[in-house]
Amino acid sequence: MNAPDPRDQLARPLNNPFAEALDKPDRYVSFCGIDCDGNARILMQHIRRHIDDPTKGNAFWDKFRDKLEGRSSERCDELFLVHSYINMIRELFETYEDDDALALLQKIEEECC
């Protein structure tokens, strides 16, 4: 019986989930190609645009801002705050019909949460 020729394996494409993750990010395979922290920072800019407006603020968003800036306790990172308050953030964006922010929130929820 002949031994398999190792060169035959070189001709076949390798099934590498990490390489595939770079083409189509999937958090269940790898976080390669997913910028969770960067997207969370951008989302915070959307949030701040609303909550820093005195006509839109309330006690909840004041506390949220304090956590973001580290005034009420240790500073929380942006991604942690998104994870913790995703439903409140969604409600904020829905209230003010901020479709771009909602799309980014959805992306973060699917890729990072």
UniProtKB/Swiss-Prot annotation:
Protein name: N(2)-fixation sustaining protein CowN
Keywords in alphabetical order: Nitrogen fixation
Transmembrane segments annotated in the record for this chain: none
Gene Ontology biological-process annotations: nitrogen fixation
InterPro entries: CowN (IPR024899)
Annotated NCBIfam families: N2Fix_CO_CowN
Organism expressing this protein natively: Azoarcus sp. (strain BH72)
Keyword Transmembrane helix set for record: no
UniProt keyword annotation of Transferase present: no
Family of the protein in this entry: Belongs to the CowN family.
Function: Is required to sustain N(2)-dependent growth in the presence of low levels of carbon monoxide (CO). Probably acts by protecting the N(2) fixation ability of the nitrogenase complex, which is inactivated in the presence of CO.
Highest taxon in the source lineage: Bacteria
Matches recorded under HAMAP family: CowN
Paired cysteines (S-S): none
